[in-house]
């Protein structure tokens, strides 16, 4: 089902340009497609590739007779570098943008620590939200294009000392793809320190973030007269807290060279005001709050990555190994966001539900002289796939002898 997309995006060429290694029996594109197949099929670990030892259809997906054994997939992760991942992400995101987010202006950023359950001696401690405390983990960083909700960047090769520079590394990555920096960036208080906000300013990029609530700040706001707070309504559908009060002012931050706009908001379900910081002076306070609320999309996407793409099933304590897994998560997320965009009425459906309703199905594959014919068995959602015409304008599949794929439905 995803072969037409991968061929249209030039996946094989992106793999070649990135310089991924291969073996005498398994070329680089087949190795990566084997790893990607596990993400697309809700498999938790590389060792679970042995579930498909005799599945010829999945072997065909990767351009092989059958998928490689778990020893190969495990070993392959240790042969890649960060440069390989960056090269593949550059090609993938640039090609996918033409289909899903051609006019991208807004990106949400977030860190995600993947907990490690073995010997912690080689790993740094990071705060783990699910445990409510710090623990040994591998820190990963993701970026999400706001409108399409498509992951567009990942890095798992980060140390604590390098953490605050990751935003600028992403900005340079984005500029290399689009010849411009993002117009808006949304991120929480842990992504960068205040000195890094100066560099964001220099890019000409607007940011919205939140400020940590110090006791002195909370006390000062508590002394402000009620007449200095303005009422507003955040009428987002299904939003729980819609009636808010805010105070809009400019403040100074340590290590930040200019005055910054601070919007203090009450009524969001917390005992103390939430402090929004932005360098934009034209948007209303209400619009700033709504913009930052949209950052939940990157958290939702990371939740799906944990739930369906099994991001938290740590591939290794070696960061470079985890980096390849994070890159495969970005690719799998893009595949499912594309699939949802093609299915009318299912644009917002999660990858897990898309998989259950449309991908997890049986059928037959017939390799003909001029094409590869895929017959889907009868299912209630087949009319939706038929209407989407995923195989329209057939594209030759380079790793399948340049044969196009045709879908038929019982």
Which residue stretches match the model-derived regions?
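An anionic, glycine-rich sequence signature occurring as long contiguous blocks
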Residues: 198, 203-307, 394-410
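Domain-level cores of phosphate- or acyl-group-handling catalytic modules
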Residues: 161-216
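Dynamic "connector" segments at or just before major functional cores
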Residues: 1-133, 140-161, 165-176, 201-203, ...
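Flexible loop/turn segments at secondary-structure boundaries
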Residues: 56-59, 115-116, 150, 160-162, ...
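Short, glycine-/Ser/Thr-/acidic-enriched flexible segments
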Residues: 112-114, 146, 156-159, 192, ...
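Basic, amphipathic alpha-helical segments enriched in Lys/Arg and hydrophobic/aromatic residues
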Residues: 312-371
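Short amphipathic alpha-helical "interface-anchor" segments enriched in bulky aromatics
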Residues: 49, 284-324, 332-336
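Short, conserved catalytic/metal-binding motifs centered on acidic residues
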Residues: 34-35, 49, 69, 73, ...
């Amino acid at each position: 089902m995803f072969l037409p997309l991968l061929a249209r995006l030039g996946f094989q060429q992106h793999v070649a340009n990135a310089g991924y290694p291969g073996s005498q029996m398994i070329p680089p594109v087949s190795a990566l497609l084997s790893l990607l197949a596990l993400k697309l099929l809700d498999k938790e670990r590389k060792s679970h590739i042995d579930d498909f030892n005799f599945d010829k259809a999945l072997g065909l997906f990767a351009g092989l007779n059958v998928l490689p054994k778990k020893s190969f997939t495990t070993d392959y992760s240790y042969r890649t570098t960060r440069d390989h991942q960056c090269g593949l992400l550059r090609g993938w995101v640039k090609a996918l943008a033409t289909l899903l987010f051609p006019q991208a202006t807004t990106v949400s950023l977030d860190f995600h620590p993947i907990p490690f359950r073995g010997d912690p001696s080689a790993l740094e401690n990071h705060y783990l939200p699910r445990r409510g405390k710090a623990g040994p983990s591998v820190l990963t960083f993701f970026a999400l294009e706001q409108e399409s909700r498509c992951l567009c960047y990942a890095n798992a090769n980060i140390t604590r000392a390098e953490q605050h520079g990751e935003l600028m590394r992403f900005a340079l990555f984005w500029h290399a793809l689009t010849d411009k920096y993002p117009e808006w960036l949304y991120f929480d208080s842990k992504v960068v320190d205040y000195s890094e906000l100066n560099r964001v300013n220099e890019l000409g990029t607007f940011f919205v973030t939140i400020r940590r609530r110090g006791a002195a700040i909370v006390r000062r706001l508590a002394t402000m007269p009620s007449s200095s707070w303005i009422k507003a309504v955040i009428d987002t559908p299904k939003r729980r807290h819609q009636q808010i009060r805010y105070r809009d002012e400019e403040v100074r931050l340590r290590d930040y060279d200019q005055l910054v706009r601070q919007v203090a908001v009450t009524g969001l379900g917390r005992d103390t005001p939430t402090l929004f910081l932005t360098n934009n002076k034209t948007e209303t306070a209400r619009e700033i709050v709504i913009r930052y609320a949209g950052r939940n999309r990157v958290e939702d996407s990371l939740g799906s990555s944990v739930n369906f793409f099994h991001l938290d099933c740590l591939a290794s304590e070696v960061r470079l190994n985890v980096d390849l897994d994070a890159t495969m998560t970005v690719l799998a997320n893009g595949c499912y966001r594309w699939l949802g965009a093609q299915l009318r009425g299912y644009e917002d459906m999660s990858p897990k539900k898309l998989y259950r309703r449309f991908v997890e199905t049986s059928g037959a594959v017939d390799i003909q002289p001029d094409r590869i014919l895929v017959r889907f068995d009868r299912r209630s959602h087949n009319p939706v796939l038929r209407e989407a015409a995923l195989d329209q304008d057939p594209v030759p599949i380079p790793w399948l002898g340049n044969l196009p794929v045709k879908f038929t439905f019982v």
